[in-house]
């Protein structure tokens, strides 16, 4: 008995799926042998790509984060104006500004003045003479152009810088005198330079205007006498004998018009005492011979022209 088996109905959504999906060919596509072969360069490119890929999924390599470079500058997230630090502020100040600030601070705080005096280095002869030369240069630049530089008008124009120079000279000179200064060579070097500065002071027609210049010569003459006496007591007066100070002081006395004659006499007495009683005629031929022999000994030329005897004496 033939029976018909009814085909179960297909749900409608199956038809909808088949309608929306793209149809695929049922037949197996045929490929030519050329398409099935792989080129050698393709294999190489594929191998290079696999080797260059980072093995992020491999358990043998763990990713590490590189340390951040150290920054030597502090981060300043908020940019705003601020005053300079003290070291940077001092770098912008010149010598005159620093001197003025330090002077005002010492005036307001007297205890700070003693600290500055004990902390500051001892002034040298060159630095002190340089300060005096600066005052001297200011004095020379203060003269009026044209006219008579020795007149009363010129004196009134330069009276203030002239007073500043003389005040500085009177302040620096005691600093280089004994007993504050123990080295005779330092004292003599300062007096030599300070006397040259006094020689350069202007001369005036009016005698009353020359009183300050004459007073400066008197003070420097007393300083010379004090230093000569102290130098004669120390080390046998070696600084006076071998420094050529007799000639230097004689030249200063000549430029001063004889106002340093007392210092010249003091130096002559000291050198005469050191040479002994037989050398009363200091500066004579005998004294000149002694000076000549002394200079030869110091220079190492003594006895070079004397023939040397060979054989039994």
From Swiss-Prot:
Task: Give the compositionally biased regions (Low complexity).
Answer: 21-33
In this chain, composition skew of type Basic and acidic residues spans: 39-50
Q: Give positions of region: Disordered.
A: 16-84
InterPro entries attached to this UniProt entry: Cut8/Sts1_fam (IPR013868), Cut8/Sts1_sf (IPR038422)
Its chief place of residence is cytoplasm
Among the GO biological process terms of this entry, one is: protein transport
Keywords of this entry? Cytoplasm, Nucleus, Protein transport, Transport
Where would you find the membrane-spanning parts of this chain?
none
Which family does the entry's similarity section mention? Answer: Belongs to the cut8/STS1 family.
Quaternary organization:
Binds the proteasome.
**Name of the protein this chain belongs to:** Tethering factor for nuclear proteasome sts1
Source organism (scientific name): Aspergillus fumigatus (strain CBS 144.89 / FGSC A1163 / CEA10)
């Amino acid at each position: 008995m033939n029976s018909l088996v009814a085909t179960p109905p297909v749900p409608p959504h199956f038809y909808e799926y088949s309608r929306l999906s793209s149809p695929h060919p049922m037949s197996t596509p045929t490929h030519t042998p050329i398409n099935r072969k792989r080129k050698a360069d393709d294999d190489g490119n594929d191998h290079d790509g696999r080797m260059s890929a980072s093995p992020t999924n491999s358990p043998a390599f763990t990713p590490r984060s590189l340390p951040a470079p150290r920054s030597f500058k502090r981060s300043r997230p908020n940019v705003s104006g601020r005053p300079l630090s003290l070291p940077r502020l001092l770098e912008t100040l010149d010598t005159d500004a620093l001197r003025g600030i330090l002077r005002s601070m010492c005036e307001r705080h007297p205890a700070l003045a003693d600290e500055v005096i004990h902390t500051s280095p001892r002034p040298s002869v060159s630095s002190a003479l340089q300060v005096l030369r600066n005052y001297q240069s200011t004095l020379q630049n203060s003269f009026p152009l044209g006219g008579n530089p020795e007149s009363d008008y010129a004196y009134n124009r330069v009276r203030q810088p002239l007073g500043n120079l003389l005040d500085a000279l009177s302040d620096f000179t005691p600093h280089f005198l004994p007993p504050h200064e123990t080295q005779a060579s330092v004292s003599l070097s300062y007096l030599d330079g300070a006397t040259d500065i006094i020689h350069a002071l202007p001369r005036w027609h009016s005698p009353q205007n020359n009183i300050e210049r004459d007073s400066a010569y008197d003070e420097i003459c007393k300083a010379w006498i004090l230093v000569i006496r102290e130098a004669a007591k120390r080390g046998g007066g070696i600084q006076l004998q071998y420094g050529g100070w007799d000639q230097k002081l004689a030249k200063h006395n000549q430029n001063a018009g004889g106002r340093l004659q007392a210092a010249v006499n003091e130096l002559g007495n000291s050198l005469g005492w050191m040479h002994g009683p037989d050398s009363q005629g200091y500066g004579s031929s005998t004294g000149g011979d002694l000076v000549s022999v002394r200079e030869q000994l110091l220079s190492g030329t003594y006895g070079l022209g004397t023939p040397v005897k060979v054989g039994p004496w």
